[in-house]
Amino acid sequence: MTLDEIYESFIWDASYTNEEYESKITIGINEAKKYKYLYPFIQPVIPEKSKCIWEPCARVIALKSDEELKPYLYLLFEWLQDLNWPGAYVIFDRLLKMPFSLLEDVLNHCKRQAKKENDELWLMALEDFSKQINL
């Protein structure tokens, strides 16, 4: 399956029942798991359909090991800039499962960046994440 076909499998259509759609994206997720690099699944931008595929893309990312996610941590924390974005909570929950020692530097960098940009939503999400990971 090509990347375009995977993206197509993630697009929801009103003609699908929930079961049909879940079956369709499961096929895409299983194909996407074969990809070594995660960039194509981190908030991909495709004309007119970008955000509708973010949730399944987040599910692909959540299946990866901590080691596989390490190079992408900054981008994954950026996904938390708006917790209303599709897939944000999938990423949030996956990051919570990682050892804090792996996340600490990137998390602190993102907090500084959010403050610098006056991005209150992102900062709130990062503070909430910090509270939950330290429980």
Residue ranges and their predicted role:
Residues 10-19, 45-50, 61, 76, ...:
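Alpha-solenoid helical repeat architecture
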Residues 1-12, 34-46, 66-78, 100-112, ...:
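Amphipathic alpha-helical scaffolding segments comprising HEAT/armadillo-like alpha-solenoid repeats
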